[in-house]
């Protein structure tokens, strides 16, 4: 049976931390940034951690071997 492939879209959007959590960049920085405050834009630059069942499903089905 062949090895499972990691989805290319997931490789571009998520990364695994050393403890096994999913790191993802925040959405909402493509356009319409004039209406946001400087504080909102500054906070959107940081990464966030995806937790819960969504993260488990992504790791299990879309990243079977993690991201190398």
Swiss-Prot record:
This is Large ribosomal subunit protein bL35. Belongs to the bacterial ribosomal protein bL35 family. Coiled coil: none annotated. The gene is rpmI. InterPro entries: Ribosomal_bL35 (IPR001706), Ribosomal_bL35-like (IPR021137), Ribosomal_bL35_CS (IPR018265), Ribosomal_bL35_sf (IPR037229). One of its GO terms (biological process) is translation. PROSITE patterns: RIBOSOMAL_L35. Gene3D superfamilies: 4.10.410.60. Keywords: Ribonucleoprotein, Ribosomal protein. One of its GO terms (molecular function) is structural constituent of ribosome. GO terms for cellular component: cytosolic large ribosomal subunit. It comes from Orientia tsutsugamushi (strain Boryong) (Rickettsia tsutsugamushi). It holds the Pfam family Ribosomal_L35p.
